[in-house]
Amino acid sequence: MSGGRLLRTEVPTAFDRHAAAYDRLVGANPGYHAGLRHAARAFALPEGGAGTRLLDAGCGTGASTAALVAMAPRAEIVGIDASAGMLARARAKPWPVTVRFVEGLVQDLSAEDLGGPFDGVFAAYLLRNLPARDAAPAALRSLLRPGGVLVVHDYALRDGPAARLVWHAVCWGVIIPAGRLLTGDAGLYRYLWRSALDFDSPEALAGRLRRAGFTGVRTRTAGGWQRGIVHTFRAEAP
């Protein structure tokens, strides 16, 4: 940590320590799982994803993987995460034989390393946490086949005070106290609060995707308390 603040390079280890409580925490977040399922539907795959290969980049304990399975039950799905503790939780859950998990940093691996190239890459709550944010979209594009689709689902606070005020209130009123109660350590949840404030606005992230070579970039905000705070981005690899 630097000055008491969790660094992005330390995030996988922090998730290892908090893996046991993670599912309980996100499960208490109204709309968390529904939001992931709604984001996954942006792939718009026909026939349950038959014949397609999907990568769940930053799969964590498998919540985003489950959203992909619900949307594309016939697709081949690979989940990758840098946290061994989170992956252990994911692997312990029941999955179809078409789902497998890999431990590693997604930006350090090639499409061939992961069994790609992929028809779609799902990056849910990932880009904020990668050490090399500027290089990350291009790294994800390299994992896609031509015409493949990237779906990003993440905190990207809309410019202006309203979204930030809601985010401050939710984090300091709910998320950080709950994290401290369940784990005895609120460091990861203070990092979550700060990382969203420091991350791109929706417009900036859309621009980052375009600069990485993606086309057809579209943005959609979540509903409820997450309106203007959580956004889904859909982009295509040329």
What are these regions (language model features)?
Residues 1-47, 63-67, 193:
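Conserved class I S-adenosyl-L-methionine
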Residues 26, 156-208:
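C-terminal alpha-helical "lid/dimerization" subdomain adjacent to the S-adenosyl-L-methionine
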Residues 53-109:
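Class I SAM-dependent methyltransferase SAM/SAH-binding core
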Residues 120-133:
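A short SAM/SAH-binding and catalytic strip from SAM-dependent methyltransferases
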Residues 134-146:
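A short glycine-rich, Lys/Arg-flanked "PGG" loop and its adjoining helix->strand segment in the class I
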Residues 148-155:
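Conserved beta-strand signature within the Rossmann-like core of class I S-adenosyl-L-methionine
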